[in-house]
């Protein structure tokens, strides 16, 4: 009986700590992104991950090739990397280049030349959170942490002490420079994804994989 009375406040207290610790930062209209002035609040089902977006009607079938600019790391005053080391930012940028190249290549022919029927895609990393070492993994085995992660998984939310990545995407018609699509997003693994909890950047990398797949899915 005493153990049950003690366990309830402990679980409740842990959940309160999780709610406070995992609120995280949300992407904003970054001042140094070219398409920022055209972004509008997203009221769609994906608004929690994509709070701001812009788009015009596009017949994506008209485009058969794509130019992917080198993924850049955003250095504006409103960047959201916290105390992440520059080496880790560079690692994520390289991984993003690989993830978006691989996924765009499944839908389009990759090219370095602009022209009719060619898209130009710009991806700019604007923020990231590393997984809290030991704690992030422990939450998958802790009663309160597992409960929290289970709820977050259903809601499509971020796991306890899990990492994430934020970035801006701009898609242009390379021939005339028209902005076709743009958005800022925060991506992270499913809250119950245990493998993504191991390694400080694993969750952010998983987020980039998911984000690259999501972009291509919107171009069909």
Write out the residue ranges for each language-model feature.
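Surface-exposed short loop/turn segments
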Residues: 102, 106-175
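A solvent-exposed, charged loop/short amphipathic helix patch at secondary-structure junctions
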Residues: 79-92, 143-151, 193-196
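Solvent-exposed loop/turn segments at secondary-structure junctions
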Residues: 73-75, 127-131, 187-190
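N-terminal post-signal-peptidase region of extra-cytosolic proteins
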Residues: 45-56, 85-86, 101-109, 151-155, ...
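C-terminal motif of bacterial Sec signal peptides marking the signal peptidase cleavage site
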Residues: 18-21
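C-terminal/domain-edge helix-coil "capping" segments
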Residues: 23-55, 157-166, 170-220
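N-terminal segment of the mature soluble domain
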Residues: 59-122
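Bacterial N-terminal signal peptides that target proteins for export
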Residues: 1-11
């Amino acid at each position: 009986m005493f153990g049950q009375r003690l366990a309830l406040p402990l679980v409740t207290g842990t959940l309160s700590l999780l709610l406070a610790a995992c609120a995280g930062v949300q992407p904003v209209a970054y001042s140094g992104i070219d398409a920022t002035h055209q972004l509008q609040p997203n009221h769609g089902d994906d608004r929690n991950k994509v709070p701001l977006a812009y788009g015009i009607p596009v017949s994506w079938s008209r485009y058969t090739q794509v130019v992917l600019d080198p993924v850049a790391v955003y250095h504006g005053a409103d960047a959201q990397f916290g105390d992440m080391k520059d080496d880790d930012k560079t690692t994520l940028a390289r991984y993003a280049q690989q993830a978006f190249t691989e996924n765009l290549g499944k839908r389009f022919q990759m090219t370095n030349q602009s022209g009719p029927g060619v898209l130009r895609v710009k991806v700019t990393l604007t923020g990231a959170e590393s997984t809290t070492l030991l704690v992030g993994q422990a939450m998958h085995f802790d009663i309160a942490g597992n409960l929290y992660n289970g709820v977050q998984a259903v809601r499509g939310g971020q796991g306890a002490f899990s990492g994430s990545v934020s970035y801006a995407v701009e898609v242009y018609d390379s021939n005339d420079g028209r902005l076709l699509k743009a958005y800022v997003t925060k991506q992270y693994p499913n809250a119950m994804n245990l493998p993504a909890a191991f390694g400080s950047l694993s969750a952010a990398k998983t987020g980039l994989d998911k984000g690259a797949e999501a972009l291509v899915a919107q171009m069909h």
